[in-house]
Amino acid sequence: MKKKIRVCLFVLVFVGCSHKKKVPDVSQIKVNLQTIRFEKDFFSIDTNNMPSSLQALYTRNKGFSQDFFFNILGIPPFPDSVAHDAKLFFSTYKSIYASSVQPFQNFEPIQEEVEKGLQFVGFYFPKYPLPTKLVTFIGPLNSYAGIITPDNSLAVGLQLYLGKDYKVYQSDEVLNMYPSYVSRRFEPAYIPVNCMKNIVDDLFASNKPSKKSTQLIEQMVDEGKKLYVLYAFLPNTPDSLKTGYTQQQLSNSFAAEKEIWTYFVENDLLYQTDPTIVSPYVNDGPKTTELGEWSPGNIGQFVGWQIVKKWMEKNDKVSLQQLIQTPSKQIFEEARYKPH
């Protein structure tokens, strides 16, 4: 039987503070980012003349059109299939496109935030090929919120950024795909964060150790490493956006940091590999049921982040690339994390 965590509610009003590192000057890092509004081109096509309209669309958007039709819409690469399925998608999603026009009429503030993030990427990873295009699109609701395309563009699916209260997100069909604890993050402010998360995932895929993490503690530190790098790319972005927690959940986690760690230790969870045991602590959810109503889902990310911060304080000459390449088990053992 697991020992329960007990946290007095009055403790949870305190806001934890992370030790802020000095933010480097990245003003000299050159970023050339062009925003391409693919959804405007797509929803301007003449559906009564699909072959020529699609050909014109291909001509204007050579790089992204193929990704959109074949990978995002999942249409077989045959002319008749593309024309038929694209027309069906057009009629099904034109109302969602209409809903996106006003909130994204001026995309410059979002582009500027993405550009700032890319400057930090270029500073910390000078050999990383920075994306030169930011492509917006409207895709299926069960498709991507954002991806890095094969031609190294950042693509953003606006259908998943129309605001947490958008009526379509309240339908039973969409709630089955995206419960409210997920759709509350369907806000435009998450676009720069998710663009940087895609780059973080790309960096980890290229640089992480070959040994797969299986123990809970390794998986938590894996997530903590990603969050630490994300913070480096977005130093001025609100913590709640980067963690995906509500501000109250984040404050609660800092306030109960010692109790959270004690729970994992006393219940012998750190070295567990059984997915049914590990999953509740490293997957998204409205809360971590085992800890209580006050907690966020994916609490393992928070714990791993604190461990990584502790290790980096002891190894302040270590680069972010070296952090990524260092085995998570090694980071845990060397950090000697023990919150007070």
Question: Predicted segments — roles?
Answer:
Residues 1-29:
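Bacterial Sec-dependent N-terminal signal peptides
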Residues 18-87:
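N-terminal mature-domain "stem" immediately C-terminal to a signal peptide or N-terminal signal-anchor/transmembrane
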Residues 37, 116, 120, 224, ...:
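Extracytoplasmic/secreted proteins, especially bacterial periplasmic and envelope-associated proteins
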Residues 43, 119-126, 230-238, 265-269, ...:
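Sec-exported extracytoplasmic/periplasmic mature domains
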Residues 83-95, 273-283:
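Short alpha-helical hairpin
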Residues 85-250, 321, 326-328:
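Acidic/His-rich structured neighborhood in mature extracellular/periplasmic domains
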Residues 221-287:
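Acidic/His/Gly-enriched intrinsically disordered linker/tail segments
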Residues 265, 271-340:
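C-terminal soluble interaction/assembly domains
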